[in-house]
């Protein structure tokens, strides 16, 4: 039982570091989400192609708005920043599926 509070305290500390880094990265000040900043390789491009239309349109809007703000060297008002708690990984399920399918194709190609 003595170890339990230490785990809880360390996980709270780690969560605090995550929130600090999230805000320090700065993409949230432009209204972007984490998944909007992923480097686009072939797997990511395919995952983006598979997004439902509403998620895809939201992503395009956030990226265009961020580019516009960046060109004008501005950031959004603080109340419009993407909050750590609200940042959902919308691309991850699609990306995992694409990677799984690619690995499966590679396995079949080996045989």
Curated annotation (Swiss-Prot):
The modification N-acetylalanine is found at residue 2. The keyword Mitochondrion applies. Its main location: mitochondrion. SUPFAM superfamilies: 14 kDa protein of cytochrome bc1 complex (Ubiquinol-cytochrome c reductase). It is found in: Mitochondrion inner membrane. InterPro entries: QCR7, QCR7_sf. It is a peripheral membrane protein. The modification N6-succinyllysine is found at residues 78, 88. The modification N6-acetyllysine is found at residues 19, 78, 83, 88, 96. It holds the Pfam family UCR_14kD. Keywords: Acetylation, Electron transport, Membrane, Mitochondrion, Mitochondrion inner membrane, Respiratory chain, Transport. GO terms for biological process: mitochondrial electron transport, ubiquinol to cytochrome c. GO terms for cellular component: mitochondrial inner membrane; respiratory chain complex III. Component of the ubiquinol-cytochrome c oxidoreductase, a multisubunit transmembrane complex that is part of the mitochondrial electron transport chain which drives oxidative phosphorylation. Component of the ubiquinol-cytochrome c oxidoreductase (cytochrome b-c1 complex, complex III, CIII), a multisubunit enzyme composed of 11 subunits. The complex is composed of 3 respiratory subunits cytochrome b, cytochrome c1 and Rieske protein UQCRFS1, 2 core protein subunits UQCRC1/QCR1 and UQCRC2/QCR2, and 6 low-molecular weight protein subunits UQCRH/QCR6, UQCRB/QCR7, UQCRQ/QCR8, UQCR10/QCR9, UQCR11/QCR10 and subunit 9, the cleavage product of Rieske protein UQCRFS1. Belongs to the UQCRB/QCR7 family. This is Cytochrome b-c1 complex subunit 7. It comes from Bos taurus. The gene is UQCRB.
